[in-house]
Regions:
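Long extracytoplasmic/lumenal interhelical loops at the membrane interface
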Residues: 60-74, 81-82, 86-129
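A membrane-periplasm/extracellular boundary helix in multi-pass inner-membrane enzymes
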Residues: 1-2, 22-65, 74-82, 90, ...
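Transmembrane alpha-helices of multi-pass inner-membrane enzymes
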Residues: 15-16, 137-140, 164-176, 180-209
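Membrane-interface catalytic loops of GT-C/OST-like multi-pass glycosylation enzymes that act
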Residues: 2-10, 115-120, 176-189
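Hydrophobic transmembrane alpha-helices and their immediate junctions
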Residues: 16, 20, 29-30, 35, ...
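Alpha-helical transmembrane segments
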Residues: 2, 6, 40-47, 137-141, ...
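Helix-loop-helix junctions and helix-breaking kinks within/between transmembrane helices
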Residues: 1-21, 47, 130-133, 179-180
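Juxtamembrane transmembrane-helix termini
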Residues: 1, 5-8, 21-27, 55, ...
Length: 209
């Protein structure tokens, strides 16, 4: 997903997820989600400038892999294949991307493959730190996800917890373009969302005792 598509879809996804988690009865979940979707469609279609912008963002017929973002993704994967265990090193994408073995990646935008990072932090971790780094990272996220699923099964509807779950889900959704997780500015938001959700989980645990 490009940046604009990613931002708009993640906003919608976060809103829908909040409705799904906040409302208890399944029937009301469906009704609320339908009404929210209807409201979005009406809002987009009745405001001419918004509708034109929406069409421009989503009507692209270009294959994702033939965009500059697709070139970044393919490049990071090839870097990982060359350094599968420990990766090429943190924040080395900018140096690796210009090397000759990456000139023939399967993308029409191969000449645009170089950047400071691959614009998806999962791929960034994979190419920079290899299987070891991504394995540790995914293990940690899975532990958080297990706690979220546990609280969902307990039908806990604490509003602060639900908001933190939505933020966590939006920030760590894998299928989107992102900033670099190893830059101080971007990593701040990822770390903050983790701190918030872990705090809320522990806070709810204490309340249940």
């Amino acid at each position: 997903l490009t940046k604009e598509r990613s931002a708009s879809l993640m906003t919608i996804f976060g809103g829908f997820l909040y409705i799904f988690l906040r409302i208890d009865k399944f029937k009301y979940k469906i009704i609320s989600l339908f009404l929210a979707a209807l409201l979005i469609i009406i809002s987009i279609s009745t405001v001419p400038d918004t509708f034109k912008r929406f069409k421009f963002i989503y009507n692209s017929e270009q294959n994702l892999l033939d965009t500059q973002w697709g070139a970044h993704f393919l490049t990071s994967y090839e870097i990982f294949k060359k350094n599968p265990i420990i990766g090429s090193g943190i924040r080395t994408y900018r140096f690796e991307c210009s090397k000759d073995y990456l000139k023939n990646i399967n993308s029409k935008a191969a000449e645009l493959r170089c950047s400071t990072h691959p614009h998806n932090f999962y791929l960034e971790i994979l190419s920079d730190t290899g299987i070891l780094g991504i394995g540790f990272f995914l293990f940690f996220l899975l532990q958080v996800l297990k706690k979220i699923i546990f609280f969902y099964k307990q039908k806990i509807t604490d509003n602060n917890l639900i908001i933190s779950i939505c933020l966590f889900s939006v920030f760590f959704w894998p299928l989107k373009t992102t900033g670099s997780i190893f830059s101080s500015w971007n990593s701040y938001f990822y770390i903050l969302s983790l701190i918030v959700i872990l705090y809320q989980i522990n806070f709810i645990k204490l309340k249940l005792r």
